[in-house]
Amino acid sequence: MPKPFTATGKKNLISANLIALRKKYHLSQRGLAHELQLAGYDMDKNVITRIETQQRYVTDIEIKALCDLFNVSFEDLIK
């Protein structure tokens, strides 16, 4: 079964909000990956890059990690 994507071909709904949150907290992609690793999540800079550029789907664990790190709700992350 093929993986779902939006009518515009996007593979996730969080890329724009992830970029905005990362910039709001003055984090580079590498810095965000480092913070996530310190929190116990196995995400590197390449994962962040691929999510932000719509080249990758996002798992529920990754969404939880980002929500926890930025202290935002799931709904706020996918708006």
List each model region and its residues.
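A short, Lys/Arg-rich alpha-helix, primarily the initiator
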Residues: 1-25
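Residue-level detection of the helix-turn-helix DNA-binding "recognition helix"
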Residues: 19, 23, 37-38, 53
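Residues within the alpha-helical elements of helix-turn-helix
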Residues: 24, 35, 69
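DNA major-groove recognition helix of helix-turn-helix/homeodomain DNA-binding modules
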Residues: 59-76
